[in-house]
Curated annotation (Swiss-Prot):
Domain of life: Archaea
Source organism: Natronomonas pharaonis (strain ATCC 35678 / DSM 2160 / CIP 103997 / JCM 8858 / NBRC 14720 / NCIMB 2260 / Gabara) (Halobacterium pharaonis)
Pathway given in the UniProt record: Amino-acid biosynthesis; L-leucine biosynthesis; L-leucine from 3-methyl-2-oxobutanoate: step 2/4
Quaternary structure and partners: Heterodimer of LeuC and LeuD.
GO biological process: L-leucine biosynthetic process
NCBIfam families in the cross-refs: leuC, PRK05478.1, PRK12466.1
Gene: leuC
Described function: Catalyzes the isomerization between 2-isopropylmalate and 3-isopropylmalate, via the formation of 2-isopropylmaleate.
EC number per UniProt: 4.2.1.33
Annotated protein name in UniProt: 3-isopropylmalate dehydratase large subunit
């Protein structure tokens, strides 16, 4: 076993060879695919008469274009139906498992992998989706890849990559009331910048990270890419192992779990591992964070004032002016009181069961504001079923939320769930780019699920700490 960081160890464990161009060829332990980025890759294989090398290490789902209101086939959207049908044909020919809506296992690719135990410490994981870094929460090296790389992995079960530096981000202390993993990652991106992670992989550590459950760790690793990093990870620990023990992969095979656990423990970063950079953030100073602009790095604490562009670094000033104009905000204001038209609770960042529970604690006993249309889109069919078993669906529906089927939904404008005109959306998703939620004039405010819930019932961005929580049964 090599020494150093988890990144060093897992990289070396999976390195096949070093290529003439200096890149390393890595074996891929898990390849996740979906309906949007895989069709061209399969087409390129057919042109060359190449078969999928390891269908047993490839797993498919549908999430990006699948509707969340009515998933009956054929889909009303012809383009979406064509993508679904093409994926079905591709996986059938290759012998790849597909979690479609008929299976009870369908959902966002970065939700179903962990919940089924496909995601494990010490694995290399790739997917044609930028938020593949989510799986790093388990101590995996997980990378988003492009179509040509999807082709290469399908054909060879390997990928050529350049090794990056490692930045350790220590979040110390205890989080305050109403502060979540989403607030941690928005704070990190705000401080280091959306390009601050370029050339790096992030290792998240410190008391505040260690105290998070797996869902919180996934939220943080999920948005590593928004901070410019190639990937992000958390070292596996007992929290990780307890999660895995209950998944499909190990619930009925405890012996296999015990066989793999020593390897998982061995890939943890060594206490004396050397890092290329170390950043420390005091978690006790973080408050609920919301974005005021059109990048995830344009965020502030809920009590802070929107910055004046001239007070920002020179290369950020023009972007800030355009963002403030688009969002209709002014320097010196806070985001508290910003009117909201739509509340979206979902996405691969925040659509897991604890996310829904925490939002339901705010929603219970209250009603969605008259000016707001609100929806909850569970991250997977399993999350949806578990939430319904706990009665969370009733909490949301009684308050006036739409309770939807699983999918990516309003995180991106590739399906029926989109903003209209200049609607402002309180969103638990990961990106607030202009046009991201379907309308070029739409305005997205990123925040935690609890903050989305608070905005839904007040009709404006609201400090969730001002709203007493109700009890919901877990």
């Amino acid at each position: 076993m090599s020494e150093g960081t988890l990144y060093d160890k897992v990289w070396e464990n999976h390195k096949v060879t070093t290529l003439p161009n200096g890149q390393d060829q890595l074996f891929v332990g898990l390849h996740l695919i979906h309906e949007v980025t895989s069709p061209q890759a399969f087409g390129m294989l057919r042109e060359r008469d190449i078969e999928v090398a390891r269908p047993d290490l490839t797993h498919a789902t549908v999430d990006h274009i699948v509707p969340t209101a009515d998933q009956s086939r054929p889909l009303d959207n012809e383009a979406a139906e064509e993508m679904m049908a093409e994926l079905e044909e591709n996986v059938r020919e290759a012998g790849i498992t597909l979690d479609d809506p008929t299976t009870g296992n369908q959902g966002i690719v970065h939700v179903i992998g962990p919940e089924q135990g496909l995601t494990q410490p010490g694995k290399t994981i790739v997917c044609g989706d930028s938020h593949t870094s989510t799986h790093g929460a388990f101590g995996a090296l997980a990378f988003g890849i492009g179509t040509s790389q999807i082709r290469d992995v399908l054909a060879t079960q390997t990928i050529a990559m350049e090794k990056k530096d490692v930045r350790k981000i220590e979040v110390t202390g205890e989080l305050g009331e109403g502060v979540t993993a989403k607030d941690i990652i928005l704070t990190i991106i705000r401080r280091l910048g959306t390009d601050g992670g370029v050339g790096y992989v992030y290792e998240y550590a410190g008391e505040a990270i260690e105290n998070l459950g797996m869902e919180g760790r996934m939220s943080i690793c999920n948005m590593s890419i928004e901070g410019g990093a190639r990937a992000g990870y958390v070292n596996p620990d007992e929290t990780t192992y307890e999660w895995l023990r209950e998944t499909d992969a190990f619930a009925d095979d405890p012996e296999r779990f015990e066989e793999l656990k020593p390897y998982w423990e061995s890939v943890r970063s060594d206490p004396d591992a050397e890092y290329d950079d170390v950043v420390t953030i005091d978690g006790s100073e973080i408050e609920p964070v919301v974005t005021w602009g059109t990048t995830p790095g344009q965020g502030i604490g809920i009590t802070e004032e929107i910055p004046a562009p001239e007070d920002l670094p020179a290369d950020k000033q023009d972007t800030a002016r355009r963002a403030q104009d688009h969002m209709g905000v002014e320097p010196g204001e806070t985001m508290a009181g910003y009117n909201i038209d739509v509340a979206f609770l979902g996405s691969c960042t925040n659509a897991r069961l604890p996310d829904l529970r925490s939002a339901a604690e705010i929603i219970k006993g209250r009603e969605v504001h008259d000016s707001v249309r609100a929806m909850v889109v569970p991250g997977s069919q399993r999350v949806k079923a578990a939430a319904e078993d706990e009665g969370l669906d009733s909490v949301f529906k009684e308050a006036g939320f739409d309770w939807r089927e699983a999918g990516c939904s309003m995180c991106l404008g590739m399906n029926d769930d989109q903003l209209v005109g200049d609607e402002a959306c309180a969103s638990s998703s990961n990106r607030n780019f202009v046009g991201r939620q379907g309308s070029k004039d739409g305005r997205t405010v990123l925040m935690s699920p609890e903050m989305v819930a608070a905005a839904a019932v007040t009709g404006e961005v609201t400090d969730v700490r001002e709203l007493p929580k109700a009890e919901v049964e877990a």
